């Protein structure tokens, strides 16, 4: 079972980067946010002609943008307006309501910051290197290092020099 996408707004988009790992039963909610600042949260305007002229409900906080090399765990839910940075990890069954920085690990309901995967200097290097944009032949050559913890070796590898 792949991701489920609920969309209440044709203008709100889901953008997913390259080489992402998406577990089963993820839910992306594009819009459909109930207005907590209105007297009722019920969508009368969507169901009754008397409210058809009233806009703004349900609402959207914007596009969902998932960066490159992101892992989203089983049964997670991502709300509209969220950007998930490159290399981030979303723990299983997390409810993501806010942006997630690159290479951060978040988990829970609502999702909270757990830790960064790497020191900031390494994150900056990975962001600048953007290996996910390399030609696929170069990525294939780099697989032994991509699937390792040899970070320093990865940054000095011949594959890096050919990009």
Tell where the protein language model's regions lie, with residue ranges.
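Acidic, glycine-centered active-site loop in nucleotide-sugar glycosyltransferases
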Residues: 102, 107-110
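Flexible, glycine/small-residue-enriched loop-and-beta-strand segment within the central core
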Residues: 1-80
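Conserved catalytic-core motifs of eukaryotic protein kinase domains, centered on the activation segment
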Residues: 32-33, 100, 116-117
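Extended beta-solenoid/beta-helix repeat architectures
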Residues: 83-84, 100
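C-terminal segments of enzyme domains that contribute to small-molecule binding surfaces
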Residues: 44-78, 110-163
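Conserved acidic donor-binding loop of glycosyltransferase catalytic domains
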Residues: 91, 97-98, 114
């Amino acid at each position: 079972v792949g991701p489920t996408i609920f969309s209440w707004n044709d203008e709100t988009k889901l953008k997913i980067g390259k080489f992402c790992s998406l577990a089963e039963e993820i839910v992306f909610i594009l819009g459909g946010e109930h207005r907590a600042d209105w007297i009722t949260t019920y969508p009368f305007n969507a169901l009754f002609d008397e409210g058809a002229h009233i806009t703004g409900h349900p609402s959207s906080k914007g596009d969902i943008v998932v960066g490159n090399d992101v892992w989203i765990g089983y049964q997670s839910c991502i709300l509209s307006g969220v950007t998930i940075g490159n290399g981030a990890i979303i723990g299983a069954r997390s409810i993501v309501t806010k942006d997630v920085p690159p290479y951060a690990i978040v988990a829970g309901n609502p999702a909270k910051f757990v830790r960064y995967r790497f020191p900031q200097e390494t994150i900056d290097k990975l962001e600048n290197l953007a290996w996910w944009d390399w030609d696929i032949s170069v990525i294939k050559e780099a697989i032994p290092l991509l699937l390792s913890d040899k970070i320093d070796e990865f940054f000095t590898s011949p594959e890096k020099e050919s990009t």
